[in-house]
């Protein structure tokens, strides 16, 4: 983690002092930095949720045998818990627009399965809007076997979306989409940290 921070600082300083040539637009470099930052924050979000789950008595596992035989547990999407295996073992489709997109966590509470995507955002913008769209898309997904989807958004932008204030047309549109898809898919959830804690408490 510290190595990543140092590399990011070095990269920013390097490009700040150097005029890029026409073959390397500065926007591309910033996009790469933003993507790496988003991935880092996403992983922090995953770890935060796993920590909350563990406090409520859920166990984290790394293989299918333990996951399938335990009532309250969580796993992260990984090589063992890839899309193919998850679809086969849980009987789900996970039909996102982006083909073969994996989510972040699989939560099991007895016979209930919840598939979770976690993001951390503080501001809006091009890359951030794309991540919000991905979270909203998760709410549209449905499964015949009652599996639920969780869109978890942490950070200042989550508070803006969940508030009653205006904040402009874009925010209002995003709120309307969230409400619409939650109404269409009542088994799904859009939560911040407090909402996630409440949901997990109810599952126990």
Question: Which residues does each PLM region occupy?
Answer:
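Short amphipathic alpha-helical segments and helix-helix/interface helices
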Residues: 50, 136-140, 178-179
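Flexible secondary-structure boundary motifs
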Residues: 82-86, 113, 117-118
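Secondary-structure boundary elements
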Residues: 51-62, 109-112, 145
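Active-site beta-strand-loop-beta-strand hairpin of nuclease catalytic cores
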Residues: 98-115
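Domain-level recognition of nuclease-like catalytic cores that cleave nucleotide substrates
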Residues: 151-204
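Catalytic cores of nucleic-acid endonucleases
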Residues: 120-170
